[in-house]
Structures are given as structure tokens and as C-alpha cells.
């Protein structure tokens, strides 16, 4: 359309998506009730969705030249996938932390969960050092595949993880 949209304009998307998708995913768990997946499966699914974000971002770099202007919908869908993954992982992680912790240490375990997210963000800042102009496809592909593989491992071993956490006897 010949319009230019600043990068800063997209900074509100994750917050808007988080509010909307948090409500949608929370409603999904309410509707599913006792049929909902175990917490590790939710985290595995969410992690795979996180990985789908970078995998999706390989597409515009494969379809268009690096100097080409592309639709802003690419970044919108990228954010949508990332935040949908977060809607699966974040609340479930906080719930698990409070469920598996001894009652006297629930707050500390919730803090440890928060610190794990900070650690992930710190690792991301290290991963950015591997980015070189012109290497967008391999960069996003590696990050996406590693993240999806981690989610798949959590899904495969979900029941064992839940049993190890003592969550097969407890409900979320």
C-alpha cells in the first residue's frame, strides 16, 4: 500500500496477544476439565509453538530477497506463534512450581520458575551473536529446530516427568 510502519509500532502486539491468547488458552483448559493434557504436555506443546515462530520466519527470507519489502503480517504471525507458546507454558510453569514445592517454599519455587525464563532470555542474547547478515534462514532454522526438539522431548517424556514431579496424584 506504499505505507511505512515503524518497528516500534509492533511492540504492543505481544502484550495484546498475551491478554487475548491467555484468556483463550485458559478457557480451553476450563472446557477440557479433567480431559486436559498433563502439565508437561502443555509445556511441550507451548515450547513447540515457540519453536514454530523462528521456523515461520525462515519463510519470508526464502521467498523474498533480503532487501525486499514484505508484508508486516509476517512479524504479526511470528509474534502470534511465540505468544501462543507462552500462553501454554508460562501459567502452567507457575502452577507446577506451586504444586510441586513444599508449602513453605512455594514462593521460592515460583521465583525459580521466573529465573528460568530470565535464563532463557539471557541465552537468547547469546544466540543473537551467531546472527550474521545474509544468514537469516540458517539462524532462524537452527533456533526453531532446537526449540521444537526440546518441546518434543518434553512431550515424549511428559508422563515420566509428571510422575517424577508427583503430579499424577495431584491436579492443577
Model regions and ranges:
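C-terminal ends and interior cores of transmembrane alpha-helices
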Residues: 45-67
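Cytoplasmic loop-to-transmembrane helix junctions
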Residues: 38, 45, 70, 74-77, ...
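Intracellular juxtamembrane helix-capping segments at the cytosolic ends
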Residues: 87-102
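Hydrophobic core of transmembrane alpha-helices in multi-pass small-molecule transporters
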Residues: 66-88
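A late C-terminal transmembrane helix in Major Facilitator Superfamily
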Residues: 98-132
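Symmetry-related core transmembrane helices of the 12-TM Major Facilitator Superfamily/SLC fold
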Residues: 137-159
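Transmembrane alpha-helices of Major Facilitator/SLC transporters
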Residues: 3-33, 46-54
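Transmembrane alpha-helical cores of Major Facilitator Superfamily
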Residues: 12, 16, 48, 80, ...
Amino acid at each position: 500500500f506504499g505505507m511505512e510502519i515503524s518497528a516500534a509500532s509492533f511492540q504492543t502486539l505481544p502484550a495484546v496477544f498475551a491478554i487475548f491468547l491467555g484468556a483463550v488458552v485458559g478457557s480451553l483448559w476450563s472446557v477440557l476439565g479433567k480431559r486436559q493434557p498433563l502439565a508437561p504436555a502443555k509445556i511441550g506443546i507451548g515450547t513447540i509453538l515457540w519453536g514454530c515462530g523462528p521456523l515461520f520466519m525462515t519463510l519470508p527470507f526464502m521467498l523474498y530477497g533480503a532487501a525486499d519489502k514484505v508484508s508486516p503480517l509476517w512479524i504479526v504471525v511470528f509474534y502470534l506463534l511465540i505468544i501462543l507458546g507462552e500462553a501454554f507454558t508460562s501459567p502452567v510453569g507457575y502452577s507446577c512450581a506451586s504444586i510441586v514445592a513444599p508449602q513453605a517454599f512455594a514462593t521460592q519455587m515460583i521465583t525459580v520458575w521466573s529465573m528460568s525464563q530470565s535464563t532463557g532470555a539471557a541465552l537468547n542474547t547469546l544466540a543473537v551473536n551467531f546472527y550474521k547478515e545474509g544468514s537469516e534462514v540458517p539462524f532462524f532454522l537452527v533456533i526453531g529446530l532446537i526449540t521444537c526438539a526440546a518441546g518434543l522431548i518434553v512431550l515424549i517424556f511428559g508422563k515420566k516427568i509428571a510422575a517424577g514431579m508427583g503430579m499424577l496424584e495431584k491436579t492443577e
